[in-house]
Amino acid sequence: MDPVRVAIQRLAHCFALPTCAHPGDAGLDLFAAHAVPLSIAPGRFTRVPTGIALGLPAGYMAFVQPRSGLAARHGISVLNTPGLIDCGYRGEIQVLLINHGEVPVVVSRGDRIAQLVVLPVPQVQFVEVSTLESSERQTGSFGSSGY
């Protein structure tokens, strides 16, 4: 598979460009790019700059997703998971981090704070119908597959 070329702009306060921790990883680590450490109190959230802007090609989008290690160790997640970046957005990528833990968490410049996943976007054409075809699941929703 050929790599997708994504334009990236390093802003003045950028710490590092997104990187994959391991070959073949789907998510690229995003780094905090603020000048002073930020403390996130339990139950609170804050916006963390990454110091980068993207030029996603037409037909692509990106998700900003939590890092599992931050969630497991500190209760830190991305508030609007997943954060959606459309191909036309050219501003700085910022991450809304929320502290679901019980103690304040300090985020410092250079910390890996989230993951960026770039995906193709299919063009959708809705076809209005009077009824939908049957399915095995039908209208089962929350908890329909068991608890």
Curated annotation (Swiss-Prot):
UniProt xrefs under Gene3D superfamilies: 2.70.40.10
Gene that this polypeptide is encoded by: dut
Family: Belongs to the dUTPase family.
Keyword Glycoprotein found: no
Domain of life: Bacteria
Cofactors named for this entry: Mg(2+)
Short name of one Pfam family: dUTPase
Alphabetical GO biological process terms: dUMP biosynthetic process; dUTP catabolic process
Function: This enzyme is involved in nucleotide metabolism: it produces dUMP, the immediate precursor of thymidine nucleotides and it decreases the intracellular concentration of dUTP so that uracil cannot be incorporated into DNA.
Coiled-coil region(s): none
Reaction catalysis annotation: dUTP + H2O = dUMP + diphosphate + H(+)
Record-level Gene Ontology MF annotations: dUTP diphosphatase activity; magnesium ion binding
Residues where substrate binds: R67, S68, G69, N80, L84, I85, D86
Record's keyword annotation contains Hydrolase: yes
Database matches in InterPro entries: dUTPase (IPR008181), dUTPase-like (IPR029054), dUTPase-like_sf (IPR036157), dUTPase_trimeric (IPR033704)
NCBIfam families the UniProt entry points to: dut, PRK00601.1
Keywords: Hydrolase, Magnesium, Metal-binding, Nucleotide metabolism
This protein's name: Deoxyuridine 5'-triphosphate nucleotidohydrolase
E.C. no: 3.6.1.23
